[in-house]
């Protein structure tokens, strides 16, 4: 969600009664999102427009959607927005996650409804666990997609052997995707 190029929200929020716990299909629904202001909103706008153009072919002049960055007070840290889409062969998301995992010094905490890992990320997490990094993963204990739930659980063994700790959220469904 991008509002006037000033504020952006990103996360796993869906729109339906079950996602605001009005209707309880899987128990209490847990999700996470982030509100972004500052220069990264421009990145979020650009990512949206790239996907918009790829899907619609709309070649309009999008300059009106791009706001000039305002001078902001210096702060410690930064936000780097990135997108990973099926329209190219780049594994941006996987590379970002692998880099974050390999540079962890104390802990790696992951919330995910769908722990579907390839060997590259599995090995990165296992190496972190074996090197003494506190690796904790929270997945749903109540599945919304049974096949994906079984696939998620099939990844547990190797991770547990490497020292990761895995928790299943049982009061409902955890839809958060956070690391």
Predicted regions and their residues:
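Charged, low-complexity intrinsically disordered terminal segments
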Residues: 1-179
């Amino acid at each position: 969600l991008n509002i006037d190029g000033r504020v952006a929200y990103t996360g796993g929020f869906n729109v339906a009664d079950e996602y605001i716990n009005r209707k309880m299909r899987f128990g209490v629904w847990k999700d996470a999102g982030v509100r972004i202001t500052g220069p990264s909103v421009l990145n979020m706008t650009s990512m949206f427009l790239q996907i918009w153009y790829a899907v619609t072919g709309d070649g309009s002049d999008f300059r009106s959607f791009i706001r000039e960055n305002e001078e902001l007070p210096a702060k410690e840290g930064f936000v780097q927005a990135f997108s990973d889409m099926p329209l190219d062969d780049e594994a941006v998301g996987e590379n970002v996650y692998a880099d974050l995992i390999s540079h962890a010094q104390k802990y790696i905490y992951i919330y995910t409804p769908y722990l579907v890992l390839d060997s590259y990320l599995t090995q990165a997490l296992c190496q972190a666990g074996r090197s003494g990094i506190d690796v904790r993963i929270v997945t749903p204990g109540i599945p919304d997609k049974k096949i994906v739930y079984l696939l998620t659980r099939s990844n547990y063994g190797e991770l547990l052997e490497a020292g990761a700790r895995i928790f299943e959220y049982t009061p409902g469904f955890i839809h958060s995707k956070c690391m």
